[in-house]
A protein has these predicted regions:
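N-terminal Rossmann-like FAD-binding beta1-loop-alpha1 element of flavoenzymes
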Residues: 3-29, 413-417
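Short hydrophobic core segments
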Residues: 5-7, 30, 134, 167-181, ...
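Glycine-rich FAD pyrophosphate-binding loop
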Residues: 21-45
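An anion/pyrophosphate-binding glycine-rich loop and adjacent beta-alpha core
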Residues: 34-42, 50, 56-57, 92, ...
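Glycine-rich active-site loop/strand segments that organize a redox cofactor
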Residues: 47-97
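Feature captures the FAD/FMN-dependent oxidoreductase FAD-binding
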Residues: 76-172
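A glycine-rich dinucleotide-binding beta-alpha-beta segment and adjacent secondary-structure elements
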Residues: 129-131, 316-395
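Glycine-rich loop(s) and the adjacent beta-strand/alpha-helix scaffold that form part
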Residues: 172-218
Length: 417
């Protein structure tokens, strides 16, 4: 039996504490807020898309950074295992197959997930310390034999120091403090500095799943217009990246599920240079089919012919840009028709940044996976120190994948202590 300290009461920290407690360990969960799961509470607009119903092998394609690192985590505690766990706790859920196979609570309430986990922590005698911030970890030097049987200097975790000066000693420590996104929920990134001071490498932090700012000023006129099932693509180092989904025009640029996913693939590039985005608003129709729609009723205004397949206010702005507002289909030249189709099938927008790391849903970057044993989540530098979730340099697309990463890495670290 070991004394295990878990730092951070988010999704991964709660799961780590639960799985650690099942090995008859004494578990202490330290949370800086007055409640557990504050970021989890806001997930999916409060609906809590806690996992995805795709096959677990399909999850790797949705991981943006360091997908191979997650092999042991995903297979130790799969999405089906997570769903079964919540089922066993009588949490009702629903699978929205038409919505990218996302899994939500039946009542669209994230608080239900938190309540299940909280109750289970109590049932497993996990001691929860609220409103306590860890400001350092306690280590001591030790030695272990290397491959050539020579003594090698290593560090051993001994506990943590709280902001009031108290020291809590333990045999194992699990770091589940998250990234820097949504800092108002308590994840301010202070643990990164602590870990750096103890020798760990911090890979640069970037905003992920974040809205994109657009250089073109006229886009403000489209503010508030929502577009369904668009395809956004760009070229990064000669490789085409393409994502499909809904998007929303905003005063600063563009947002929505499709945009957020794309942001995770270009966030590092747009720190250095602008990125040209190509947007196809009707990916299921080719140019000839759109041409037929434009000219469907010759004596009608172009907008009237297209409003069944595109939002009317979107069409008004596009046609205004082309000075074709009130033109009838019969009066439209072939050149102008091609221009309209080009705007619909291949609108070019210049992305010049994001709305910032605090507005991202998750943090890209974090503690280097090279310094963590992926089979156990244990630090390779400090014995008996473990990591979970967003504090590690791993992130994924929207759709429940990031929460599954949190639960899976939390579970694996907990059973490994």
């Amino acid at each position: 039996m070991s004394k295990v300290i878990v730092v951070g009461g988010g999704a991964s920290g709660m799961m780590a504490a639960l799985s650690a407690s099942k090995n008859n360990n004494e578990v202490i969960l330290i949370e800086r807020n007055g409640e557990l799961g504050r970021k989890l509470r806001a997930t999916g607009g409060g609906r809590c898309n806690f996992t995805n119903n795709r096959e677990i092998e399909d999850f790797f394609d949705k991981v943006v950074n360091n997908k191979k690192f997650l092999y042991s985590s995903f297979y130790s505690f799969t999405n089906k295992d997570l769903i079964s766990y919540f089922e066993s706790k009588n949490l009702e859920y629903k699978i929205e197959e038409e919505n990218d196979h996302k899994v939500y609570t039946k009542n669209d309430k994230s608080i239900e997930v938190i309540e299940v986990l909280n109750k289970d922590l109590i049932n497993h005698n996990v001691k929860i310390m609220y409103n306590k911030k860890v400001i350092d970890i306690i280590t001591e030097e030790t030695t272990e034999k290397d491959d050539s049987n020579k003594d090698k200097l290593k560090y051993l975790i001994k506990g943590v120091i709280l902001d009031n000066g108290d020291k809590i000693f333990g045999d194992k420590v699990i770091i589940s403090t998250g990234g820097v996104s949504y800092s108002k929920t308590g994840s301010d990134g202070s643990m990164y500095k602590i870990l750096q001071n103890h020798g760990h490498t911090l890979n640069r932090l970037y905003p992920a799943l974040v809205p994109l700012t657009i250089e073109e000023k006229w886009i403000k006129n489209l503010q508030g217009i929502s577009m369904k099932s668009v395809e956004i693509s760009c070229k990064i180092k000669k490789k085409k990246i393409s994502k499909t989904g809904d998007m929303l025009f905003a005063h600063f640029g563009i947002t929505g599920p499709c945009v957020l996913i794309m942001s995770s693939y270009i966030n590092k590039i747009i720190e250095k240079e602008k990125v040209e985005l190509n947007i196809d608003f009707l990916p299921n129709l080719n140019a000839d089919e759109i041409s037929s729609r434009i000219r469907e009723v010759p004596n009608k205004n172009i907008i009237n012919n297209l409003k069944q397949i595109l939002p009317q206010n979107f069409l008004k702005e596009i046609l205004a840009l082309l000075s074709l507002n009130d033109k009838k289909a019969s009066d439209l030249s072939k050149v102008d028709e091609i221009k309209i189709i080009e705007y619909i099938k291949n609108m070019k927008l210049t992305c010049n940044g994001t709305t910032g790391i605090n507005t991202g849903m998750v943090t890209s970057g974090g503690i280097s996976v090279k310094e963590i044993n992926s089979s156990t989540m244990e630090s390779k530098l400090i014995k008996n120190l473990f990591f979970t979730g967003e504090v590690i340099d791993i992130d994924a697309e929207t759709g429940g994948y990031n929460l599954q990463i949190a639960f899976s890495t939390g579970y694996l670290s907990g059973i490994s202590v």
